[in-house]
Regions:
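Short Cys/His-rich "knuckle" micro-motifs
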Residues: 176-179, 190-193
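Positively charged, low-complexity intrinsically disordered regions
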Residues: 166-167, 190
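Cys/His-coordinated zinc-binding microdomains
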Residues: 171, 184
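Extracellular calcium-associated, cysteine-rich motifs in secreted modular proteins
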Residues: 187
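Charge-rich, low-complexity N-terminal segments
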Residues: 1-164
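Cys/His/Pro-rich metal-binding microdomains
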Residues: 168, 181
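Processing junctions and N-termini across compartments
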Residues: 164, 174-177
């Protein structure tokens, strides 16, 4: 079964090297849908709490909200950094409070302080799906991601090979030590009983 959560993201980008209107800097409101698949966790009677999917995903997705997303070889990128530096906002501003976790992967790098994401490839709906899956695949059992932006849409299905160990008290994934990061419940494999962490 699947738990499904959606996010709205406002961002600006352009298709560097593209022949058409998208070569100009422009903005979108995109809708990202993440479907998490697993068995129903008997303790909480759900696959995965949607509010916990939102918290887990939003930690990295907020880097894309109200952000400028440019390809790493886009010649406008140095000019943007220069203007941000002249404005004194390259390293952050007092009112930039919605910063996500910085990340650097093969596909993209986030600069949360200045609301900038630099990508390896042009930021299309397909590209966004690749980046999001890469960032979240170890945190959630993602079965499908759909991203719509303007009149563009793409979706991709992913194989979910094994069940994720989850807390029977609140339904979220256990950490590498078998402890729930939210309530402290511990998976005690030796006795088969769960108990609060000490």
């Amino acid at each position: 079964m699947r738990s499904i959560t959606t996010f709205d993201l406002q961002y600006a980008h352009r298709f560097y090297g593209f022949c058409g209107e998208a070569q100009y800097l422009h903005g979108h409101t995109g809708t990202l849908t993440i479907e998490v698949e697993d068995s129903i966790n008997a303790g909480v009677n759900m696959v995965f709490p949607c509010n916990e999917i939102q918290k887990t995903a939003w930690d990295v997705l907020k880097n894309f909200d109200h952000a400028l997303i440019l390809r790493e070889d886009d010649p406008i990128l140095p000019a943007i950094r220069q203007v941000y530096s002249q404005q004194g906002i390259l390293n952050g501003a007092p009112h930039n409070e919605m910063k996500g976790e910085a990340f650097c992967t093969e596909l993209a790098r986030a600069y949360p302080e200045c609301r900038l994401v630099v990508t390896k490839e042009t930021m299309t709906v397909e590209g966004m799906i690749k980046i999001v899956y890469d960032l979240l695949r170890d945190k959630l059992n993602i079965a499908r991601i759909t991203f719509t932006s303007g009149v563009n849409a793409a979706t991709e299905e992913f194989d979910v090979e094994e069940s994720m160990r989850r807390c029977p008290m609140c339904g979220i994934a256990l950490d590498e030590n078998g402890v729930c990061p939210k309530c402290g419940w511990r998976d005690n494999r030796t006795t088969g009983l769960g108990e609060p962490a000490v």
